[in-house]
Amino acid sequence: MPFGNTHNKFKLNYKPQEEYPDLSKHNNHMAKVLTPDLYNKLRDKETPSGFTLDDVIQTGVDNPGHPFIMTVGCVAGDEESYTVFKDLFDPIIQDRHGGYKPTDKHKTDLNHENLKGGDDLDPNYVLSSRVRTGRSIKGYTLPPHCSRGERRAVEKLSVEALNSLTGEFKGKYYPLKSMTEQEQQQLIDDHFLFDKPVSPLLLASGMARDWPDARGIWHNDNKSFLVWVNEEDHLRVISMEKGGNMKEVFRRFCVGLQKIEEIFKKAGHPFMWNEHLGYVLTCPSNLGTGLRGGVHVKLANLSKHPKFEEILTRLRLQKRGTGGVDTAAVGAVFDISNADRLGSSEVEQVQLVVDGVKLMVEMEKKLEKGQSIDDMIPAQK
C-alpha cells in the first residue's frame, strides 16, 4: 500500500542492499530491469505527490508473474512517475512495446472515417465487438496513489461531465455502493462491469483501497457506450454491441470519447497526454492509445490448427479466453484483439483487428470444408 513519505525517509536508514527486493523467482518486465544499482539510484526519489520507487514496483514484487504471460510488474502513481522514474520505466516500455524508444513520438487518430471496412464481419462467427480505452484526468494522482477525497472529486467531475451528454449518449450513472450484490454480479456476467477487486495486481498496487467508495459505471440508455469510473484508471471508456459491426462500434467510440474530452477541457481538466507516451495511464502496458479493440469470435477449427498461435502473432493480434484475461475459451469462442498500444494510432490498431479477424473467419470456413489454409497464412505485419 502507498505510505507517506516519512516512511520512505525512514527506509533510507537501511543500506540499499538491505532494502532491495528478492526478485530471484520473478518473470515480469520490472524484475528484468531493476538491478541493485538502479534501485540504489532511484530509491530516495519521489514525485511531487510523494509516490516512491517502492510504490511503483510493489505490485511486481508481490506478483512474481505468470509462467507464460509476461506481466509488467509496476504502476505509475501520477503523471510525473514516468519522468521521475524514467530510468526504470523507459526500458520497460521499450521491452513491452516492441522496441519503442525514449525519443519516439506517438500518434493519435480518432477520426473514425479513416477506418476501412469493418461493417462486414460475419455475425455467424463474430458474436460481439468492443473497443475500449482509458483516460486520466490532469491534476489528480492515479488510482494506486489517490486519496479518498481525490477519488471522490474525480467521480464528481466525471459524473457531471457524463450526465451532460445528449442524443445517443444520454445516460445515467450507477454508483457501486448503491447496487445490490445481484445487480453487480449481473452487470459483471454481462461483461458491462469490472470485476470485484480480487486481482492480486489491483490489490498489491493499492488500487482497491476504500472499495467500493467513489467507483461506478455510467452507461447510455441502450448500454452500447459505457464508462467505468475509478477502477484501474480514472476513466475506462467502452463502446460495444452484439454482432460484427466494428465500424459502428468504432464510430460511437470516437465520437463519444471526443465529446467527453471536450467537456473535461472546458472544465479546465484535460486528459493526461504527451507526444512521447500518448495518453498517460496507470499501467505502462496501456500507454499510447490505451485502446483494445476486440471481438468475440467462434473459431472451432482454426483454434486447433498447429499454426493458430503463429497466425495471431503475424497479424499482431492476441487472444484471451471468453471472459477476458486468465479465462478459458468457452465453446471455442475467443476474445481476439490488437496486441499494440504505443507507436501506432487508434485507427491503425482497429484496422489490424478488422482485417485480421476477417482473414481468420475465411480460414475457419475453409477448414470447415476440410480444405487446407497453408496458402492463406499471412506474412508478418
From Swiss-Prot:
It is found in: Cytoplasm. PROSITE patterns: PHOSPHAGEN_KINASE (PS00112), PHOSPHAGEN_KINASE_C (PS51510), PHOSPHAGEN_KINASE_N (PS51509). The keyword Transcription regulation does not apply. It is an enzyme of class 2 (transferase). The modification Phosphothreonine is found at T166, T180, T313, T322. One of its GO terms (cellular component) is cytoplasm. Pfam families: ATP-gua_Ptrans, ATP-gua_PtransN. ATP binds at residues 128-132, 191, 236, 292, 320-325, 335. Residues 11-98 form the Phosphagen kinase N-terminal domain. InterPro entries: ATP-guanido_PTrfase, ATP-guanido_PTrfase_AS, ATP-guanido_PTrfase_cat, ATP-guanido_PTrfase_N, ATP-guanido_PTrfase_N_sf, Gln_synth/guanido_kin_cat_dom. The modification Phosphoserine is found at S164, S178, S199, S372. It catalyses: creatine + ATP = N-phosphocreatine + ADP + H(+). One of its GO terms (molecular function) is creatine kinase activity. Residues 125-367 form the Phosphagen kinase C-terminal domain. Keywords: ATP-binding, Cytoplasm, Kinase, Nucleotide-binding, Phosphoprotein, Transferase. Its EC number is 2.7.3.2. Its main location: cytoplasm. Reversibly catalyzes the transfer of phosphate between ATP and various phosphogens (e.g. creatine phosphate). Creatine kinase isoenzymes play a central role in energy transduction in tissues with large, fluctuating energy demands, such as skeletal muscle, heart, brain and spermatozoa. Dimer of identical or non-identical chains, which can be either B (brain type) or M (muscle type). With MM being the major form in skeletal muscle and myocardium, MB existing in myocardium, and BB existing in many tissues, especially brain. This is Creatine kinase M-type. It comes from Mus musculus (Mouse). The gene is Ckm.
